[in-house]
């Protein structure tokens, strides 16, 4: 009973609180932390050699730097971001992770020295991308049907689900299957992912524009009160007329 009593004290963050704590409220911070944590945990559980961990260090550093460069405009105006901005941020984040992995495999580590590590990181990125696309489509569908109203809150919940799921699968089953065969590394798949993310961002942008359009029109509507030529009689006259009629 004490656990349920503690849960009943939980309250959602208000708009004023979100403005005071922007780093907690913005969901793309949670996306970055959960995605990199899932990649880090999955890699360290699968590989434990010093040279293989060196590949992880290079990849984390390079992907983080590329993500900062690609998302510099979004990070500069993080207080003014919308759902469309966050979707584009997510797309750039995964592209930074992907291209840094390709750059390490073909430029830094030559002669296919880290081919297994490259395959594993590539496959794990693909799994995260497919999961996040499913989450974005699910949130967009729920928002359209009126089920989800707070994009940041719902997305943060799904990020926690992603982290817990990856941890559970890694501990119980392991991720050895992801380092045996490359899933798909073609440009067609990357173009498809880009197009899908752009379509989702356009849908969010259109929804926000339509919502603001309807709100502005509703605010401009003025209700004209009914005008009567003859004012209603006072209450005393109504009572006197009723007494006279009874007599």
Curated annotation (Swiss-Prot):
UniProt keyword annotations, A-Z: Host cytoplasm, Host nucleus
Organism: Autographa californica nuclear polyhedrosis virus (AcMNPV)
Domain of life: Viruses
GO cellular component assignments: host cell cytoplasm; host cell nucleus
Function comment: Accelerates mortality in insect larvae.
Protein name: Protein AC124
Cellular compartment(s): Host cytoplasm; Host nucleus
